[in-house]
Amino acid sequence: MNVFAIMATCGRHRCAERALTCFLKQDYQGEHTLLIHNNSPVSQSINLPPLPANKHVILLNRSTDEHANRYASLGAIYNDSIKVVPSDADLIIFWDDDDMYLPNHITSGVEGYKKAQEEGFRAYKPFYSFYRHSGGIALVANNMEPSVFVQASEIKRLGFSNTTSDQHMQWYAGLGDKIFVDMAGKPTLIYNWGDGDKWMGEQFVEHIPTFKTSGNPGNPSNFENYRGFSQEHGDEVLTPIADELIAAYYAEVINQNT
């Protein structure tokens, strides 16, 4: 199956680099593409290693809609992003820039979707995901959109509401009971709630600032508040993070849940 992942990002340079690295580490053997829709007026370029023939990364620097107006919501950004999805894409998934994804995220999700599809479902998600927060890492039941694998035609049909924080509800609610929630599904999404200093042993590695967009979808200023904080543009070149650092993030999850 051909999987198309969408990452909307704006002024969270180190988050985007980490999420990009998670995509490059995916072990999926089928076609898979990551669209990075950078909606900041500060353009980014990308520094990629040689990629296998089945793995693709697209960088879209676009901060305005079709009317040349600055995007006013995350939903509007996603509605433009899905216009880039090719006709041969089977599944659409969401690759939030501040979250992380185990190397088997796509492989496991596609396997689950294929089984669900046989029963007439249009989307698949495991019941649990990892929840990474200041107190550690836990397994939680959730409706987190990045854990859902959705038939591409359904996302294109239903689209997103032009809102922030609840923009996914249009397709999520539209699918209703066509989403198969797998109680035995492998948790592969690492959902971050806040970030901060990263240490490897006693060595300080980096600080990743994240500013959450959720929690107040009814406030029309929420999106402007988010953009006001998201001003981390780095060197304006998205570069994968070091292998040992992404391995340390993965080990943090695995060690606390074995």
Residue ranges and their predicted role:
Residues 21-31:
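Short, acidic, metal-binding catalytic loop of nucleotide-sugar glycosyltransferases
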Residues 31-41, 60-64:
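Short beta-strand/loop segment that forms part of the nucleotide-sugar
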Residues 122-137:
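Short beta-strand-to-loop element that shapes/binds the nucleotide-sugar donor at the catalytic cleft/hinge
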Residues 99-112:
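Acidic donor-binding/catalytic loop of UDP-sugar-dependent glycosyltransferases
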Residues 18, 162-258:
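C-terminal catalytic/acceptor-binding lobe
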Residues 89-100:
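Short beta-strand-to-loop acidic/aromatic patch adjacent to the donor-nucleotide binding site
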